[in-house]
């Protein structure tokens, strides 16, 4: 059977979602053309052109690199329908009007390739009804594909089949969305708002009702329903502002229009809350309108007050007693909240009870398994646990009895009882819906295993739900060596893996020792070494706290020794006789960045943020980062002009002196921390698979470490040029005197110090300059202020 390939995608509709879906396709290097209506005035593509230009301005950016917006093809329905013929996937993302969508499908049908998949990004309209406008030949290739906003950052994509969708089409699309786009796929049934929005929006509406019942303010509720509750840090009302209150109202209307008391016993709870209507009527649509439930005025945050229709000061916090309750084990936590006397505790129990109740009643109608619900809420709403996971962790039958007691007492939002499967049969016997055999499918009455599509073979450690069986990276494979700092192990006996275990995967002397030992072992018995950790970040940098005791006891010489050891570790990585591959995900800062750039190859997750940030704590990169900048500048100059180092050096100097961090793997490549020979991976859970195979490919290709070479530096003339611009910044008040001092030291290292331009140096020479600069700063009072400020508050000190 031929492998399904997506060589080109058409996105129909250049609105907020359509344009951002196109942007994400560009991020992962999928050719895409964006369609919209022809403009009534001016160039006919101007609607699409404006949408693409707007992508460059959005924050957070939908693009890995803003300039890549220009790679999106532009088209309109009047002139360019022929471009659809070579598209393998067509994603429709126009406004949520059934009649408009049906009309568009009729228009595009004659231009579709026989093999093309057509998918609607509707957030809740019936996929089956939408398919009725398509010719019979296209219906088997039609389905729903619901991205969450913003599509670059949100993991969830829901796929929805119709009765006529070919199973292979859904399998092919799931593979592409998972591996090609880096998303978590949940298959939803064709019901209003599918899974995540059905559960999530119903939960938000219920929360708004309970807020009124218990007389709480929006700031207190957000404090209670954010990180403390294991949910998105934005809480309930800030999340609504980010989503857009008009968007939320539209999703609510979908529920109102397509459900009834007969199909949803909670239907009476779906009325538009008075506060939501009042805000929308006033034009306060949330973040995009700069006012919603909250409003920022200068540095002050205000909250809306329904009674007065005015904004009043916000910032109130929840009573700390409930913060302590929420830290207790799940079973104890829920019982404490249920028995709480104060309104905040009663409110928390009410919203949790409502979520358990709603999810259980509707599981069979909206999803195949409980796994689909919990994954949808994790990936679509930023929850650490889905509703069934929390319920199971707290004690399945105990919680079920508490919920049913509240239903019987009339305290719940609906009189609908919990389904029989909650109390009887396999779920009750297993103590929950997630087991080693699989997740509960109420329609079949069995625990159903995960889909075993080939694409999931690329995920050595998929994200598991509570109660699921599966490998855990902390104990998987064969451990070769392990201590508190690092685990050295192998999955296949061919490639060695080093996993850093310190907090934030900070690089301590023990980590360096472990890496050195791992390289020694890999050179003797393995094809390569992969540096990978199963969770984020890759590494937040050198472990300053681990260095402080030696510094206090011995003085700066201890720091110089530690820095020297880190530098030697980096050189050992670079010149190892087997390939060392760094599998980077999340933050790779300071020493973490240096660890990555000194590896033979980097395999980098799209959402990786890489940079040399030592300036923020008053230091310079001291483990080879500045040496790397100087060497790369020389290499780039050699392949370009062969003479002028300064243009290439200036880019690296600026990145280090301004502590620039790439906001994606693509931007990190522009900063020089990711090379064009490196691999960028869309899905975080495929990182280890790709890194292991990259190490094997290098080994099988006859990998040899690079030669130790001399290379030219810019010398005193280059330093003088750089210092000239720094003087202007200092005198203009853009940087402090200490910033100027640090930047001057960086300039001195990357240019090679007081030597003639073009002088040939080696890495050891530049690393000596690095150590001296680093050690001169660590005893500086202003640097010590910055270090202590960061350690105590987590925030940079500017002095």
What are the roles of these predicted feature ranges?
Residues 1-529, 533-536, 543-578, 585-592, ...:
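N-terminal glycine-rich phosphate-binding loop for ADP-containing cofactors
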């Amino acid at each position: 059977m031929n492998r399904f390939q997506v060589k080109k995608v058409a996105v129909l509709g250049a609105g907020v979602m359509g344009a951002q879906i196109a942007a994400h396709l560009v991020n992962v290097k999928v050719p895409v053309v964006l369609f919209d209506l022809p403009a009534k005035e001016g160039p006919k593509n101007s609607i699409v052109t404006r949408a693409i230009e707007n992508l460059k301005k959005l924050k957070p950016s939908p693009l890995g690199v803003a300039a890549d917006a220009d790679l999106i093809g532009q088209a309109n329905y009047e002139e360019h329908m022929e471009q659809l013929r070579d598209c393998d996937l067509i994603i429709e993302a126009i406004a949520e009007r059934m009649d408009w969508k049906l009309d568009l499908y009729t228009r595009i049908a004659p231009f579709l390739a026989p093999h093309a998949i057509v998918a609607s990004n509707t957030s809740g309209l019936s996929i089956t009804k939408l398919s009725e406008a398509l010719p019979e030949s296209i219906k088997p290739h039609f389905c729903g594909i619901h991205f969450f906003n913003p599509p670059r950052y949100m993991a969830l994509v829901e796929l929805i089949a119709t009765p006529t969708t070919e199973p292979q089409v859904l399998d092919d699309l799931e593979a592409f969305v998972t591996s090609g786009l880096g998303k978590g796929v949940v298959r939803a049934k064709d019901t209003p708002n599918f899974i995540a929005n059905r559960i999530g929006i119903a939960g938000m509406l219920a929360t708004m009702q309970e807020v009124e019942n218990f007389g709480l303010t929006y700031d207190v509720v957000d404090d209670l329903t954010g990180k403390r509750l294991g949910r998105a840090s934005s809480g309930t009302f800030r999340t609504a502002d980010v989503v857009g209150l008009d968007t939320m109202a539209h999703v609510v209307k979908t529920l109102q229009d397509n459900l009834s008391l007969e199909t949803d016993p909670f239907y009476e709870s779906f009325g538009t809350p008075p506060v939501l209507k009042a805000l929308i009527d006033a034009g306060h649509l949330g973040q995009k309108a700069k006012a919603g439930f909250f409003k920022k005025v200068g540095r002050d945050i205000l909250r809306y007050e329904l009674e007065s229709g005015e904004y009043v000061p916000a910032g109130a916090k929840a009573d700390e007693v409930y913060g302590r309750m929420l830290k207790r084990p799940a079973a104890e936590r829920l019982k404490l909240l249920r028995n709480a006397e104060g309104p905040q505790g009663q409110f928390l129990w009410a919203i949790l009870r409502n979520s358990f109740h709603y999810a259980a009643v509707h599981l069979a109608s909206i999803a195949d398994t409980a796994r689909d619900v919990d994954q949808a809420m994790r990936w679509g709403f930023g929850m650490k646990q889905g509703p069934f996971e929390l319920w199971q962790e707290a004690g399945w039958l105990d919680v079920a009895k508490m919920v049913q007691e509240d239903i019987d007492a009339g305290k719940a939002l609906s009189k609908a009882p919990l389904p029989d499967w909650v109390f009887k049969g396999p779920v009750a016997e297993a103590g929950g819906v997630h087991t080693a055999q699989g997740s509960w499918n109420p329609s079949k009455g069995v625990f159903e295993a995960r889909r075993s599509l080939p694409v999931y073979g690329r995920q050595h450690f998929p994200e598991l739900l509570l109660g699921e069986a599966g490998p855990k990276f902390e104990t998987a494979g064969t451990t070769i060596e392990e201590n508190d700092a690092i685990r050295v192990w192998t999955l296949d006996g061919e490639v060695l893996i080093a996993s850093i275990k310190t907090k934030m995967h900070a690089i301590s002397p023990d980590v360096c020792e472990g890496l050195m030992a791992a390289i020694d072992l890999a050179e003797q018995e393995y094809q390569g070494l992969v540096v990978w950790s199963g969770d984020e970040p890759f590494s937040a940098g050198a472990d300053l706290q681990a260095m402080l005791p030696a510094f206090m006891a011995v003085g700066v010489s201890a720091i110089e020794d530690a820095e020297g050891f880190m530098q030697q570790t980096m050189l050992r990585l670079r010149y190892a006789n087997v390939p060392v591959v760094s599998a980077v995900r999340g933050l790779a800062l300071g020493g973490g960045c240096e660890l990555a750039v000194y590896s033979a190859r980097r395999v980098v997750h799209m959402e990786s943020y890489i940079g040399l940030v030592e300036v923020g704590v008053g230091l310079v990169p001291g483990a080879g980062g500045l040496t790397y900048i100087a060497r790369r500048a020389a290499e780039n100059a050699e392949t370009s002009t062969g003479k002028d180092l300064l243009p290439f050096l200036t880019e690296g100097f600026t990145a280090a002196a301004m502590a620039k961090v790439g906001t994606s793997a693509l931007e990190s490549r522009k900063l020089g921390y990711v090379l064009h020979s490196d691999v960028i991976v869309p899905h975080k859970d495929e990182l280890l698979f790709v890194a292991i195979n990259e190490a094997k490919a290098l080994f099988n290709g006859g990998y040899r470490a690079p030669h130790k070479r001399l290379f030219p530096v810019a010398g005193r003339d280059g330093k003088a040029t750089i210092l000239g611009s720094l003087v202007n910044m200092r005198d203009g008040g853009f940087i402090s005197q200490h910033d100027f001092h640090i930047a001057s030291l960086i300039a001195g290292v990357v240019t090679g110090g007081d030597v003639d331009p073009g002088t040939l140096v080696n890495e050891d020479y530049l690393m000596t300059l690095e150590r001296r600069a680093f050690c001169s700063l660590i005893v500086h009072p202003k640097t010590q202020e910055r270090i202590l400020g960061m350690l105590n508050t987590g925030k940079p000190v500017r002095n």
